[in-house]
């Protein structure tokens, strides 16, 4: 992009040298009229909603919370290896095929529900919303068992690269910190992975480091990092791979207003008449002897949950992406990031101590209820299904396009088996026959070629390489797409492959008398 800059004079001058311009995918990607449909199986996940259940350092029940992100990594087949019917569709010597996302529907199964999260030892003292008396001196431990319903959020992010998140973390101080001093904090970016916690009303922060009392947030967050999508950064990405489009809906209000117990690290200035008037010390009351806590906080609530405000279980048609990438899935991959806690239903399972869950007659005649005779368990379940519609497109292998793709992502050219000619050998090399013999030197370890750029991250990988179909009329989202585009009007849809823009005029039949 070309930016005009100011000079010491009173005029603005253009840049001295031309600046490279990022091309939109519509400028070098040619569409065809070939469409494919694909979908997943019913995707299910079950676990404990608050923490991992471990047995001898082995996770027996994973943490599965409605307040976690689900990041689906869809692996698509290579269209350049398709045995297409129409040989005139593209020229493999001068063109390459790519997928373009045109339709998407993320289905959520199960009923709507409002879950509860909390902490059996939450740091809160008194009710600061409508107190009836002034609290006195704090005891050593003021923690209480408090629960609340989390903030209600729905997020859908679609792109060919993982979504970027942000949170507040500890920063390195300029000088050594004193004991008990407040540390500096900084905004940190990270890749949103499957299972990361989202914001439920307490902000996006690294709670394991910021809350050393382990009593400031619910159990789901106290040992986790809460991440919020960095929409400002992703929407300003020059290539637009992280987000083709996104949907977001938030809803919350303050249910309870509390204060934190403990010593005030930054007490209110005591200058009389500025922030408050000093109470009379002769008056024996709690106001003069023990000033209340000034670290206030709220517990959120998601309020009413209805099906009228759902982002999911409805189709989305991509006509124009928000960035320069208009739905092209580079690398034959698609990332779908989902956050939805409107289906926050936690099952309570009770099992009698001296029986199993499979026992038919687990209650004996004459038994009287006793709390200690039953063990209580919690489980959270989630149900997903993803349907996609892709359009087959082709890219001309011109010099300008290859140069642009090489700057944007060199892996694209490597996957297309396009590379520069290697230089000629400069000299003779040594080759041992018995390289593993004790009489020769140790063999040189060949580094393993790592072709996965996201190997260090955790995603819910979905293999769709063998789930593509060109008969869109046989599937729900496919029929919606055909009717939406006017390709199906009560007639049988065509399933042959033709290039976009190519048409053949049939010869008129001559009428014979």
Curated annotation (Swiss-Prot):
Pfam families found in the cross-reference section: Late_protein_L1 (PF00500)
Compartment(s) of residence: Virion; Host nucleus
Residue spans crossing the bilayer: none
Keyword tags: Capsid protein, Disulfide bond, Host nucleus, Host-virus interaction, Late protein, T=7 icosahedral capsid protein, Viral attachment to host cell, Viral penetration into host cytoplasm, Virion, Virus endocytosis by host, Virus entry into host cell
Molecular function GO terms recorded: structural molecule activity
GO cellular component terms, A-Z: host cell nucleus; T=7 icosahedral viral capsid
One GO-annotated biological process of the protein: endocytosis involved in viral entry into host cell
Source domain of life: Viruses
Family label: Belongs to the papillomaviridae L1 protein family.
Function summary: Forms an icosahedral capsid with a T=7 symmetry and a 50 nm diameter. The capsid is composed of 72 pentamers linked to each other by disulfide bonds and associated with L2 proteins. Binds to heparan sulfate proteoglycans on cell surface of basal layer keratinocytes to provide initial virion attachment. This binding mediates a conformational change in the virus capsid that facilitates efficient infection. The virion enters the host cell via endocytosis. During virus trafficking, L1 protein dissociates from the viral DNA and the genomic DNA is released to the host nucleus.
Quaternary assembly: Self-assembles into homopentamers. The capsid has an icosahedral symmetry and consists of 72 capsomers, with each capsomer being a pentamer of L1. Interacts with the minor capsid protein L2; this interaction is necessary for viral genome encapsidation. Interacts with protein E2; this interaction enhances E2-dependent replication and transcription activation.
Protein name: Major capsid protein L1
């Amino acid at each position: 992009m070309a930016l005009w800059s100011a000079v010491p004079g009173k005029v603005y001058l253009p840049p001295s040298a031309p600046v490279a311009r990022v091309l939109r995918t519509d400028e070098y990607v040619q569409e065809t009229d070939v469409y494919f449909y694909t979908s997943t199986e019913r995707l299910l996940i079950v676990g404990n909603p608050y923490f991992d259940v471990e047995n001898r350092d082995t996770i027996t029940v994973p943490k599965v919370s409605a307040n976690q992100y689900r990041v689906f990594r869809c692996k698509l087949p290579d269209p350049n290896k398709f045995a297409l019917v129409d040989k005139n569709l593209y020229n493999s010597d001068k063109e390459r095929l790519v997928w373009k996302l045109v339709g998407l529907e993320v289905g959520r199964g199960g009923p709507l529900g409002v879950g509860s999260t909390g902490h059996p030892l939450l740091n809160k003292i008194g009710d600061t919303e409508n107190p009836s008396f002034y609290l006195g001196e704090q005891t050593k431990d003021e923690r209480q068992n408090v629960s609340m319903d989390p903030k209600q959020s729905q997020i859908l992010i679609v792109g060919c690269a993982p979504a970027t998140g942000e949170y507040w973390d500890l920063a390195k101080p300029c000088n050594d910190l004193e004991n008990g001093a407040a540390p500096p904090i900084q905004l940190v970016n990270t890749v949103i992975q499957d299972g990361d916690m989202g914001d439920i009303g307490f902000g996006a922060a690294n709670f394991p480091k910021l809350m050393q009392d382990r009593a400031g947030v619910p159990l789901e967050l106290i040992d986790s990092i809460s991440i919020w999508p960095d929409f400002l950064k992703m929407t300003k990405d020059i290539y637009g791979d992280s987000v083709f489009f996104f949907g977001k809906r938030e809803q919350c209000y303050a249910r309870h207003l509390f204060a934190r117990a403990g010593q005030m690290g930054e007490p209110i200035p005591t200058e009389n008449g500025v922030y408050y008037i000093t109470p009379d010390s002769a008056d024996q009351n709690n106001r003069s002897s023990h000033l209340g806590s000034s670290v206030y906080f709220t517990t959120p609530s998601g309020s009413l949950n209805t099906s009228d405000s759902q982002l999911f279980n409805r189709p989305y048609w991509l006509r124009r992406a928000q960035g320069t990438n208009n739905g092209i899935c580079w690398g034959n991959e698609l990332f779908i990031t989902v956050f939805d806690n409107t289906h926050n239903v936690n099952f309570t399972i009770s099992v009698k101590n001296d029986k199993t869950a499979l026992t038919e007659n687990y209650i004996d005649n004459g038994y009287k209820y006793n709390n200690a005779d039953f063990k209580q368990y919690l489980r959270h379940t989630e149900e997903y299904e993803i349907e996609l519609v892709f359009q087959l497109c082709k890219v001309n292998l011109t010099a300008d396009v290859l140069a642009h793709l090489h700057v944007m992502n060199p892996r694209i050219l490597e996957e297309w088996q396009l590379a520069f000619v290697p230089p000629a050998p400069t000299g003779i090399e040594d080759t041992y026959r018995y390289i593993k013999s004790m009489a020769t030197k140790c063999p040189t370890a060949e580094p393993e070629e790592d072709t996965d750029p996201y190997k260090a991250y955790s995603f819910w990988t979905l293999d769709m390489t063998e789930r593509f179909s060109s008969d869109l009329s046989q599937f729900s989202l496919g029929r919606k797409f055909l009717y939406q585009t006017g390709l199906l009007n009560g007639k049988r849809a065509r399933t042959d492959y033709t290039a976009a823009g190519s048409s053949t005029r049939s010869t008129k039949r001559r009428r014979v008398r």
